[in-house]
Amino acid sequence: MQQGEGARNKLKLQLMTLRRSSKFRILCFIIGLLTFAASPNCAKADPTPEAVSAFNAYVKTVESRLAQQHQSRNGFLAPPLTPQNEKLLQQGELIIEPVTPITGSALPGALLHDWRGTAFAPGATVADFERLMKNISAYPQHFSPQVLQAKVLTQQGDHLQAFMRVRQKHVITVVMDTTYDITFGRLDDQHGYSLSRSTRVSEIGSPGTAEEHTLPADEEHGFLWRQNTYWTYEEGDGGLYMQIESVSLSRSVPNGLNWIVQPFIEKIPRESLEFTLRSTCNALRK
């Protein structure tokens, strides 16, 4: 009996040690992500009408805030940069932070993400930035490997519609065809902004092969349903301060996988903004 009890205690100790190990956590993380990505019970044909309505209402408040923000040189960036933050940005650092979203309960079956990132491009101007961002066909060059294809569909002055095929790689690779409605505006020659709203997001199956096709809604992973991107940029200190705010809608985390998948989902927007800002700074240096 004592030997049996001792063996059980030894086994418990080994399991506890395993759970604390980084390898065990990584294994659970990967299993959870693969389950999240592959489980047919997780797939949703489309975001619910309630989720879309909540997303649209949230976007309306964001755009109202930005419209007011863009009417004055004071506080053109939000929040206003402190001297310490300006120094960090001028040293090449990025400032990336979440913007408090509405509660998840208001989005049945979906998650809303709102993140903001700021960078500084020495020597760049508002004109340089707009020239870069309006050159849609060059996006695969400047924003590789995320942007695979890009082209302007229609353009009237500072308003255009664009197509982009994008790739997201996080454990699994997802390729999507997207279209955006984009508008550029200026307060003056040193202060500008742009609004980009997704009008279509479709996941592609077997991309780049003879079997390439648009996936039916009920076969999509739901990693991205909606995405709006807002740029704010102003000249100062011999360069250009650039701020991007990204508001997106994706499917929710299945019950029981929150503790594994949630950190991964929160990591995606941060890494996406970091990639976009770094790539933009690099392109402006060329």
Language-model regions, residue ranges each:
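Bacterial N-terminal signal peptides that target proteins for export
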Residues: G4-F29
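Bacterial N-terminal signal peptides
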Residues: L27-A38
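Sec/Tat signal peptide C-region and signal peptidase I cleavage site
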Residues: S39-A45
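Eukaryotic helix-grip
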Residues: D46-K286
